[in-house]
Amino acid sequence: MALVVHLKTVTELRGKGDRIAKVTFRGLSFFSRVLENCEDEARFEQAFRWPIGSQVDGDEMLEIQVFNYSKVFTNRLIGTFRMVLQKVVEEGHLEVSDTLIDDNNTAIQTTISIEIKYQTMDGSVKVWSDGEFLDIPDDLDGTFQFETDSLLSGRSQSSGTSPGRSIHGIPTFRKAGKGVFSAMKLGKTRTSKDDHKKGDDAAILDAEDLDRKAMRLGGILDPDTISLASVTAVTTNVSNKRSKPDIKMEPSSGRPVDYQISVTVIEARQLVGLNMDPVVCVEIGEEKKYTSMKESTNCPYYNEYFVFDFHVPPDVMFDKIIKISVIHSKNLLRSGTLVGTFKLDVGTVYTQPEHQFHHKWAMLSDPDDITTGCKGYVKCDIAVVGKGDNIKTPHKASEADEDDIEGNLLLPEGVPSERQWARFYVKIYRAEGLPKMNTSIMANVKKAFIGENRDLVDPYVLVQFAGQKGKTSVQKSSYEPIWNEQVIFTEMFPPLCRRLKVQIRDSDKVNDVAIGTHFIDLRKVSNDGDKGFLPTMGPAWVNMYGSTRNYTLMDEHQDLNEGLGEGVSFRARLLISIAVEILDTTSAEIMSSTEVHMEPVSNISESATGKMEEFFLFGSFLEATMIDRKIGDKPISFEVTIGNYGNQIDGVSKPALAKKKKEGGGESEEEESELIHNSSEEEAEDDGDLTSVPSTPPMKPVITDRNYFHLPYFEKKPCIYIKSWWQDQRRRLYNSNIMDKIADKLEEGLNDVQEIIKTEKAYPERRLRGVLEELSTSCSRFVTLANKDQNLSGRTKLDRERLKSCMREMESMGQQAKTIRTQVKRNTVRDKLKLVLNFLQRLRFLADEPQHSIPDVFIWMISNNKRIAYARIPSKDILYSIVDEEMGKDCGKVKAVFLRLPGKKGFGPAGWTVQAKLEMYLWLGLNKQRKDFLIGLPSGFEENKAVKGIGIQAVPPISLVYNMKQVFQLRAHMYQARSLFAADTSGLSDPFARVFFSTHSQVTEVLSETLCPTWDQLLVFDNVELYGEAGELRDDPPIIVIELYDQDTVGKAEFIGRTFAKPLTKMVDEHYGPPRFPPQLEYYQIYRGNCAAGDLLAAFELLQIGPAGRAALPPIDGPTDSDRGPILPVPLGIRPVLSRYRIEVLFWGLRDLKRVNLAQVDRPRVDIECAGKGVQSALIQNYKKNPNFSTLVKWFEVDLPENELLHPPLNIRVVDCRAFGRYILVGSHAVTTLRKFIYSPPDKTANNWAHTGDIVVNMSPEPNIKKMDTVVKIEATTDAVVKVDLNEDEKEKEKKKKKKKKGEEVEEEEPDESMLDWWSKYFASIETMMENLRAQEAAQAEAEEREDLEIAAESAEIKADDFPMKGTKPKEKSKDKKSTKDKKKNNDGTEKRPPKPKVDELMVYNKELESEFGSFEDWLHTFNLYRGKAGDDDDHNVVDEDRIVGRFKGSLCMYKLPLSEEITREAGFDPNMGMFQSIPHNDPINVLVRIYIIRATDLHPADINGKADPYIVIKLGKSDIRDKENYISKQLNPVFGKSFDIEATFPMESMLTVAVYDWDLVGTDDLIGETKIDLENRYYSKHRATCGIASNYSVHGYNVWRDPQKPAQILAKLCKEGKLDGPHYGPGGRVKVANRIFLGPTEIEDESGLKKQTEEHLALTVLRHWEEIPRVGCKLIPEHVETRPLLNPDKPGIEQGRIEMWVDMFPMDVPAPGPAIDISPRKPKRYELRVIIWNTDEVILEDDDYFTGEKSSDIFVRGWLKGQQEDKQDTDVHYHSLTGEGNFNWRFVFPFDYLMAEEKIVISKKESMFSWDETEYKIPARLTLQVWDADHFSADDFLGAIELDLNKFPRGAKTAKQCSLDMVLKEHELPTISIFKQKRVKGWWPFVAQNENDEFELTGKVEAELHLLTAEEAEKSPVGLGRNDPEPLEKPNRPDTSLMWFMNPLRSIRYFIWHNYRWLILKALALLLLLLLVGLFLYSIPGYLVKKLLGA
């Protein structure tokens, strides 16, 4: 019998070296031969044979290790391959290729190939089928619930698995389709205590190897591309996140922050009212700002920008209400009448994408009358910017889309556009446990006189919601007031204000103060889904927290009672309920006002809130360390309180006790006895006289070290216990706990996945699958647990609804998790990770229970009867349940608790010192569950009770005495720290670390002047005594606290930061070896307050000292090469493995160095240091003359860790060399990550394909030329923007063009070249940018939707209505809207977008170029140099910017030695320049800098009137241009259109500052904002940022080529610099560069129209696709405009506006460029609009005639274009129209200036009579026509109006009959015309006005003719106003009915009688004739009859 292993190859090795392999089986090892100088692959091709005596067992192992071989040192392990031989035993022969794993059990890239044969004597090898491996019998399910942290803890649970599976016994497959993993249990399954003693199996095989093998057995090679792969899920943590407890020390909320709210009021539409003069008021909090007033219009246009600045805590900010109101005819004397308002809170805006609403319509409603409906719309932008928020401003270009008001309402996503009015009922029943709020002096006086003892508080409740307040009555002198009142608010539903604030206040004669505050988030008490519910809550108790209960006149923590910051003590609890009722506003009996009103409500029963239960809280203090030394001199005790129970200093106010007795809940004797009677018999015996013990006995602290003390508890641990009575609402907390645990588990898993991705470990997708696996299992477990609960007492509506919705959500989440799990592939990990992060947010949201039950527990440290520091522990975290999942996460566990100072004291440096660290055990449960309260304590203690005797077993102990203790040694391997806080004025620190563990502490050595200390020190803590059972300490060891300090020569060390860690624990009986030991170095994040302050690289291990003493511990073998005295270095095996690296440094120059100690820097030098080695630059002899270095490249060699993540930082220091050999530190910079500077040799494969044949790049969609691949072809006609892969749109465009060529009529003529200018190009480009943005957004939305649909489709089991995640429905809604809108547009041909005229375009970047092109640091990097102490959060004034004292320009390149020779053998390799080949010289160079400033947008107002008078200031070196004369008056969006030329010399003048200042008539001008541009980096960048490459080459016209070098010259230069072959121009418009061929046009037209041959187009094609050129290609900067934010140093981090500009640079040693492009603002064109009012008809009749009561009107028509004040014109009056008909023949003439590109009229006028100069306004071109009734004595009456937008208005009707109201109401659906295109138009238009019901009605019709002429045309054919010459109009033929009673009675009779009674008269006449006929008939018939009869 023998086992033969054929070792074939090992591939994907890193670096170059000698390799050797070692193959081990049954303890016998063979070594392979040594392969020398292997690079990528080692071909061993060797066989090893083991003759064996006994059969090979299925679970025996084969191990192969691959090493780097070294003759001198020990061989270094590359990786290991281990394999279980089960498959070999069964099949006899196997070929395997698999990846190796490293020491950490992580798969690495290196792959091994082997072949194994097993020869048995009898040939008994079974055939092994796939099915067997995949099918696992169901009955085994239970046994595979292995622990999730088994990899971490090293515990191996292999019981119950069949032999021969993996060591873990984790069968990874079951029959596909059965649901893959056996369900992971959510709660941690407790294992028997002796489990771990089995010891760690030394070789844990990674579950993943099994997975891979299993796949291969099925003949599959790539594990993650196939469906089976989705089976591979890893549910154990891969990264060791457990060792990093995340403990936040400082309260995060409550600290004030800078906010800026900007509101742009653009316009209003459809305002309700007649002939109004509207003003818009924007109100935020107390501040109000108003727009200007617009006269006589219902759709005013404002475009005014307002800014509000705040400095408040976030919570206060987000609760502020933004109120937008429209007021009619407000002036100095009158406040005006309110038209309507719109309200939302700041938080709603902040939660929007980008923190803003852009161009949305706010719907106004009338707060005084809710039955009226919509009162109009205001279009506005609202943005909320916090410090450091970066807001992308959408470009302010096209406004066509936003006219659809309904589709663009200012509402968050998910809120329906039709909001209804609703009543919000807040019922206030009663309160309990109020603190006293008056000093007792007066009370004592009163008591002495009157003899009564009153409660010292007069409470009432204040409720605030949506900017309104309501309050209850005041209950005098009552600690337990009963109100039974309700506050009723009327507000739109859903409301846009998220929180409701309920506050108990104390009524006082001087000022009322808050007792406690509670916020109710409406989103948490409602659900907006299909099966959702309206906001509802209670009746439930809410707990209020705030300052401590002792009353002082000046309470320093009063803010806490107002709800700011975390409450530090229980204040009271309040019984409330909330309900909402949607109103039907049509019903008559409804109250129409929105005022808040109060009503009494009936009392509710005691039991409504749940059954009263007795709760028991037990706590034990196992350790109290790190007590701040300030309080270390007096005895200290700890007090634990829950509600008012346990509070001995200022707890229950005595008079209230009598009441408490009824409920059971106090401390007097009769109460106890009463309780005993109520309780069951045995309890009565047990509890005999159980009184609470809420505090520990005082004890004097003992010193730990110079900063901290500890309490000497040793083996005697004090305990506390409290009995309290609360309503039993544990179910709420249980559900919350389950969800919290699921969320914690999910968060841990996701952090792990992120860590795997970050550290580039293998298979993050498997871990993510495992996470989703666990999530879906946990969700289904939640549903079963939540379903079980049947206890209904005290259940509120919210409880029931919330449970239903939580179950629905969890079910759907579980389904989605299952679905997503199947979609996780290697390439989708990041996307899916984002999706799963949404789950986490949803879980956290669901877990937050809005209805409180048991108050939180507070632990106070008390010294000298004063409260010093506290910790607050949510009661749900320590709540006990028999079901594991429902138990609080800290219940019955020992936890580290850190105490902190209360309130504002906890902010800033004072709050950073730990006040005390407690190791504490807490348990809270029902008194009847009390038997379990000691269940989780570390075992080995005896109880010490207060009372001795029989029958008191159940009395809790007052202390525990531990007899069992374990002795440990802690080893803290402190390797290094990086990016520490700069604590000294030099900008550096002298850091040392202090490590605290239990009651011990030690320090590292102090390293001076560094922010990245490498201590490399092992701290050994001997004889650390820990109490408790060994196994528990192993699984959950105590926390280690590491604090970093800066050593100061004088005074005490300054705190730098703190981090926490947990050690890896080894018990005596465990083996010290892989995979758990030795521990790996890890980075721990250091925090200073809430700010990250660096990282610590360290490892910690806790080793149990057994009976053999320290001798048995693993030896400490440090490196032998250095002797550091008593300091132990970090031992081998833990310290990183080092390799030799060379670091090359490019020294370019220094810039902007500030003075040091008032002296200028003259002779600076740069020192570079990394890991103890370094290099110095050459000395700059005269910094002023030339700040560049003479020697460019230097290098040094250094040993660095092979693991890139452990690389130490590189330090850059600049020193100034002064006389007498002194040198002074100027500034320093630490490069924390060297990763981006690591040199990677160019990919050989990339070089090889250069020889495979030419690649032709083609631009046209025709079939590709068959040369090799693709071809670039640009005809002279194609579109300006060329992309290599033509996307769909472009193909469409091409098709369209071809159609056009075929002779189809083109809709819009090509614009004439002479008409076009630079601005045409600019506006066309902006439109393109907007279209691209829109397309991107649409694509993104579509992708998201598709993703949702995929998930929905795959999880089809979900009931249709449960599925949608929040926010999917509204999307669909908006999509429908869009599609209907599009349909509308397409049905009528006019609204379709006209095809864009062909204009050459440029690139508009809506950010600065630097962010688009990596700050132009492609080879030259800028390192900021810092000096001075870093600022903390509260030193708002010290920002990092202020610490910058200069910049070092240079670069780094590091690579492993030795370097391959190919690189150095390259042609022209300069050994002096190392890796920095082909870098230009850094000699001074003269450059012409040309700066183009286009415009600024959204400037911060600088004047009192809310405007600014901006002008441009440009600084570069000594040049300083102030364009003060050309300031632009009162503009926040000024168009500058200027260019400036400056000559500069690099490097002395390289920082360009462009600033916008505000011009002031008196005093100095203020800076609005500035932006800085580093021109040098741009100049030298490979992206060629000197002058943008235009899209087309033209020699004349608006798009003339502006670079002095033509494209062909540029291309030739680039090819030469990049050592490329080419350019070779060939026939047929081809050019070849390297191996690419480009095609393009070859002719050019000059000004005279002659065509000539040119290569420029071809060269330009190559330049525009330069990034595709192999090896040297990169994107060249196109012709562009960049948008840069303006910042003001006084308001750091908040944008003050934006500026659009670009910069060109031209070297002075080449031919000079042509003149600058003219970008001066377009002058508006002068037009004249002539409006002839011919007739009116059907005008409503307003006047009653004095004599006859007859209706008539005296009609005249008024019109204006710019504004009523500016150019109002009236016709004459048509008196006494009885029919509504009026004849005028009257001409209005309106001259105006018009900007075609912006479609705006430009007016210049003085803003007020006091204004210094005229202000320019741009307003839309709208013609207003109104019809009025003239009155002689009173004011004229307004009858109706029409407003025509001259760019698009409905075509007039041909006759008055066809003219209808629809022309106004359905304007969007009708075809529209533009007067600028039609020039002349005539027709009938309706006049409209609103009636009493605010509905539009027709009030008349007007026949008018509009005629537009340019100023020149108007001059040639002048006309007169009215009916005057020239070209007079004839007088109308009016019926003369004025004053005619006396003049012409007949005519008037005709008018009055005939007009009104004509039908009556006609009917009467007809009747008369009929009667006459009948009479004549009757009269003549007898005679006629006689005649007939007689036959006469």
Swiss-Prot record:
CDD domains: C2A_Ferlin, C2B_Ferlin, C2C_Ferlin, C2D_Ferlin, C2E_Ferlin, C2F_Ferlin
Family matches, as PROSITE patterns: C2
Stated family: Belongs to the ferlin family.
Protein name: Otoferlin
Binding locations of Ca(2+) 4: 1831, 1834, 1837
Species the sequence originates in: Danio rerio (Zebrafish)
GO molecular function: AP-2 adaptor complex binding; calcium ion binding
Side Extracellular, residues: 1980-1992
Gene designation: otof
Cofactors named for this entry: Ca(2+)
Binding site for Ca(2+) 2: 1503, 1509, 1558, 1560
Composition bias, Basic and acidic residues: 1356-1399
Membrane topology term: Single-pass type II membrane protein
Coiled coil: 1282-1363
Record's comment describing the protein's domains: The N-terminal first 124 residues can be classified as C2 domain, based on their 3D-structure. They are not sufficient for calcium ion or phospholipid binding.
Source organism superkingdom: Eukaryota
Pfam families named in the record: C2, dsrm_Ferlin, FerB, FerI, Ferlin_C
Sites where the protein binds Ca(2+) 1: 984, 990, 1046, 1048
Domain named C2: residues: 1-98, 241-362, 405-536, 952-1077, 1124-1250, 1470-1588, 1711-1860
Chain ranges on the Cytoplasmic side, renumbered to this chain: 1-1958
Function description: Key calcium ion sensor involved in the Ca(2+)-triggered synaptic vesicle-plasma membrane fusion and in the control of neurotransmitter release at these output synapses.
Gene3D superfamilies from the UniProt entry: C2 domain
Keywords of this entry: Calcium, Cell membrane, Cell projection, Coiled coil, Cytoplasmic vesicle, Endoplasmic reticulum, Golgi apparatus, Membrane, Metal-binding, Repeat, Signal-anchor, Synapse, Transmembrane, Transmembrane helix
Spans traversing the lipid bilayer: 1959-1979
